[in-house]
């Protein structure tokens, strides 16, 4: 599957080019609804360099198609997420992940 994108709220303007620094708010859940991460709960957005492999492949591909101000649901298959290894004892092996991501800005 890779990454499936469902737009929740339309954004405006351009999409971020590969190599840009993007700032997002996100909430990550398992398909059973268990929340495993939330930048809003921490009160701080998350920054990363798009396309540099700093995040899972599903994020690099999904966020690259978003516009500033857009909020989308990214449904990410295990091969575009953490795969057979899972992550940090929180994400089980071969888990499909669901992220609600808001692209705040890029530069």
Curated annotation (Swiss-Prot):
User: Which top EC class applies here?
Assistant: isomerase
Q: Under which name does UniProt file this protein? A: FK506-binding protein 1
Keywords from UniProt, A to Z, are:
Isomerase, Rotamase
User: A Pfam family name for this chain?
Assistant: FKBP_C
Give GO MF terms, alphabetically.
peptidyl-prolyl cis-trans isomerase activity
Gene Ontology cellular component? cytoplasm
Tell me which residues make up the PPIase FKBP-type domain: 19-107
Q: Which family does it belong to?
A: Belongs to the FKBP-type PPIase family.
Recorded catalytic activity of this chain's protein = [protein]-peptidylproline (omega=180) = [protein]-peptidylproline (omega=0)
Function per UniProt? PPIases accelerate the folding of proteins by catalyzing the cis-trans isomerization of proline imidic peptide bonds in oligopeptides.
Domain of life, source organism: Eukaryota
Q: What start-end ranges are recorded for coiled-coil regions in this protein?
A: none
Query: What is known about regulation of its activity?
Result: Inhibited by both FK506 and rapamycin.
**InterPro entries per the record?**
FKBP-type_PPIase, PPIase_dom_sf, PPIase_FKBP_dom
State which Enzyme Commission number(s) the record gives: 5.2.1.8
